[in-house]
């Protein structure tokens, strides 16, 4: 960590999570002379949603998450969103592979492991849905290796815990993508920030809180930073600012004063996992098994039983159980939600509250659940689960986007959204899932939008193609490019399956 703070930087990164670390890495690879400073109010990087245990660690390729493939009225399934997320994850794999090849990440097994992704449903209607989904997805080259089975012995071979003790007459179906991954985004964030901190023209400042940000007369930004150790305050100017501060992003967007952020708000959702560290159990489950959310439930309610590999230790995670907290960050304040209310966003927020009563009911139900009720949900996936083998763990806070719509109206968004100033000198990332898995895709979009001059006229595009070989290629269409890059990155990242 740097002891001195430069008064002027080219790029200021606010927040030291996976998003800022990814954007900073790409920018420094494209132009090593860029002067970049990263500010984080906590004492380490990756401590909020990027933290290893604050997210599910799914290499989010839309292999198994059924909320990305909604049914159509005619009985078919819409797979367009799944294909987008699937190929966006390929960009992250390419960036990581480049860093491994360059020696900037020594061993990819420090953050990523092969882990099959499975969808698991029961009941005639759900089985019919999953089979239709499989038929459509496996016909596309992006999912050509997807497997489907209703055979109970086959399912038990793939995931024994979900079958042992189950009613033999229950109608079941699964899909399986053997090439899925488990990603430790906390470890990855540390690896990215470490290699950044070893470069010239990069400053890292922990325990430094950005308390205000305003446009200056030169078109750049004045950033007021407080050293939380000494309580000294500093003024830094930056040509470009990226806010990747998770739940803090709403506050900094509002302080920036950019008109593009007017009317935006946030709706915080807390999460709880059940976690099992017993080797005798975790060693018998090697998959991320996603179920189907109840009709009318929000996307955050999709239950899943996951293998997690963190610091070489295999564990299991089940959940999430959602709840409500007015905090925007785990290390935040209970006043966060109330302090985010402005005249410009109060009507969209009230409109969302009025139109999303089902979400309110769902969250109330989750908050009122007893531990016994929570455990019954686990037993739907793992019938022989025992209370004593599991402990409760608090997940990261997710702040869903409340977005202004027509006059005085608002909509609740469950994805991520990048908001930039008109002159492209300021960007902020709002939202949650799929988040970390598509960090490279988001960073590339920032570069295309906010560094267009450098990309087109200063050689950045050729350098970007060296880092991301399929840049400019639509992997949803080019089957050969898709197969080739997946084989290449699997080899470099040591993800090859038997």
From Swiss-Prot:
Top-rank taxon: Bacteria
Enzyme class: oxidoreductase
Required co-factors: FAD
InterPro entries the UniProt entry points to: FAD/NAD-bd_sf, MQO
Listed pathway(s): Carbohydrate metabolism; tricarboxylic acid cycle; oxaloacetate from (S)-malate (quinone route): step 1/1
Reaction it catalyzes: (S)-malate + a quinone = a quinol + oxaloacetate
Its EC number(s): 1.1.5.4
Protein's name in the database: Probable malate:quinone oxidoreductase
GO molecular function annotation: 2-hydroxyglutarate dehydrogenase activity; L-malate dehydrogenase (quinone) activity
Family matches, as HAMAP family: MQO
GO biological process: tricarboxylic acid cycle
PANTHER family from the UniProt entry: L-2-HYDROXYGLUTARATE DEHYDROGENASE, MITOCHONDRIAL (PTHR43104:SF2)
Similarity section: Belongs to the MQO family.
């Amino acid at each position: 960590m740097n002891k001195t703070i430069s008064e002027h930087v080219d790029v200021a990164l606010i927040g030291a999570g996976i998003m800022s670390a990814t954007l900073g890495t790409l920018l420094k690879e494209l132009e090593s002379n860029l002067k970049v400073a990263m500010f984080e109010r906590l004492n380490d990087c990756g401590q909020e949603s990027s933290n290893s245990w604050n997210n599910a660690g799914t290499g989010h390729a839309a292999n198994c998450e059924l909320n990305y493939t909604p049914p159509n009225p005619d009985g078919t399934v819409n797979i367009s969103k799944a294909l987008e997320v699937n190929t966006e994850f390929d960009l992250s794999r390419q960036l990581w592979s480049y860093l491994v090849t360059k020696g900037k990440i020594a061993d990819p097994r420090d953050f990523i492991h092969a882990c099959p992704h499975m969808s698991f449903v029961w009941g005639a209607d759900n089985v019919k849905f999953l089979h239709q989904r499989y038929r459509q997805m496996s016909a596309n080259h992006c999912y050509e290796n997807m497997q489907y089975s209703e055979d109970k012995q086959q399912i038990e071979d793939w995931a024994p815990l979900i079958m042992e003790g189950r009613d033999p007459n229950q109608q079941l179906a699964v899909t399986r993508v053997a090439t899925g991954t488990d990603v430790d985004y906390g470890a990855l964030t540390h690896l990215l920030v470490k290699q950044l901190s070893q470069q010239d023209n990069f400053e890292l400042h922990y325990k430094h809180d950005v308390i205000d940000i305003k446009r200056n007369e030169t078109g750049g930004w004045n950033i007021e930073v407080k050293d939380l150790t000494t309580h000294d305050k500093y003024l830094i100017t930056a040509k470009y600012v990226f806010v990747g501060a998770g739940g803090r992003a709403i506050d900094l967007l509002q302080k920036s004063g950019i008109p593009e952020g007017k009317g935006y708000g946030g709706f915080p959702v807390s999460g709880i996992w059940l976690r099992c560290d017993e080797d005798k159990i975790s060693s018998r489950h090697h998959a991320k098994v996603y179920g189907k959310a109840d009709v009318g439930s929000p996307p955050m309610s999709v239950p899943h039983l996951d293998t997690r590999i963190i610091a070489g230790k295999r564990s299991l995670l089940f959940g999430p159980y959602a709840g409500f907290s007015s905090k925007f960050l785990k290390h935040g304040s209970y006043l966060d939600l109330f302090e985010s209310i402005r005249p410009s966003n109060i009507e969209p927020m009230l409109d969302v509250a009025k139109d999303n009563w089902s979400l309110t009911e769902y969250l109330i139900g989750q908050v009122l659940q007893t531990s016994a009720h929570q455990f019954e949900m686990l037993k739907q996936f793992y019938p022989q689960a025992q209370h004593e083998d599991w402990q409760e763990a608090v997940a990261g806070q997710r702040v869903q986007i409340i977005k202004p719509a027509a006059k005085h109206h608002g909509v609740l968004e469950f994805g991520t959204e990048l908001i930039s100033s008109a002159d492209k000198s300021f960007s902020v990332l709002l939202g949650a899932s799929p988040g970390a898995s598509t960090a490279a895709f988001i960073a590339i979009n920032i570069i295309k939008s906010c560094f267009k001059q450098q990309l087109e006229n200063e050689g950045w595009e050729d350098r970007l193609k060296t880092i991301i070989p399929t840049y400019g290629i639509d992997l949803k269409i080019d089957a050969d490019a898709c197969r080739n890059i997946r084989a290449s990155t699997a080899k470099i990242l040591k993800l090859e399956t038997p």
